[in-house]
Amino acid sequence: MVPVGYLKQEVKQPLHLSRLNVEPEDLGVAGAEIALKDNNTTGRFTKQQFTLDVEKVPVGGDAAASLQKLADSGHHFVLVDAPADTLLKLSDSIKGKDVLLFNVGAEDVNLRQEDCRANVLHTAPDRDMLADALAQYLVWKKWQRWFVAKGVFPEDLAYLDAIRRAAKRFGGTIVEEREYKGSLEARRTDSGQQQIQQQMPVFTQGAPDYDVLIVA
């Protein structure tokens, strides 16, 4: 029997444009449970069985204590669904112990570069990988002129850097970068609701010719 831990750090979620954009509470965990069932089905033939134990850490909670709890109960493999800074702290807290962490959520590029850790493996693609994949597809489709709507949050700017890098690598052309200063919900006027779709013609007015609008 191989016990596998799943440590999920809850983070404060922004307001969503639509209820359809709200993440399900078991996001990530549900995927691990499906994988567990699949592996245990074939595991009957290879005499391998896996169990999954989930530790959810509330916003501002002690993720290191939850990881230590899993380690003390014999979990040598722990899936970590947490922001990059939390992942690095967890890696340092468990250094030298027989525990291997799997990054299943953080997309930060530095985790595979200057902040690479020997006790962390990655299943989540980083932003550069995601941008490279998008760029290769767009160039293959001959959609090489890109209009970029950029946000103002650190995550937005990090993805924007990845898009710029991918454009240079694969031959895309960013015809314009335009900052989108919007709220995170549909209320944009004092008089009531205004659909985001209706804002796009105004937002893109006067832009150079482009094949694709990329949201960063």
Give residue ranges: language-model regions:
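Short beta-strand segments enriched in small/hydrophobic residues
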Residues: 1-28, 36-38, 146-149
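Structural motif
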Residues: 79, 212-216
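Short beta-strand elements in bilobed, periplasmic/extracellular small-molecule ligand-binding domains
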Residues: 41-59, 116-120, 167-193, 212
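Extracytoplasmic ligand/sensor domains, especially the bilobed periplasmic-binding protein
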Residues: 75-179, 183-184
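Signal peptide-proximal N-terminal region
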Residues: 15, 22-54, 171
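A generic secondary-structure signal
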Residues: 38-42, 69, 136-140, 165-166, ...
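Soluble non-cytosolic domains of exported or imported proteins
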Residues: 19-30, 57, 61-64, 81-88, ...
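Short, well-structured alpha-helical segments in soluble
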Residues: 57-76, 137, 190-209
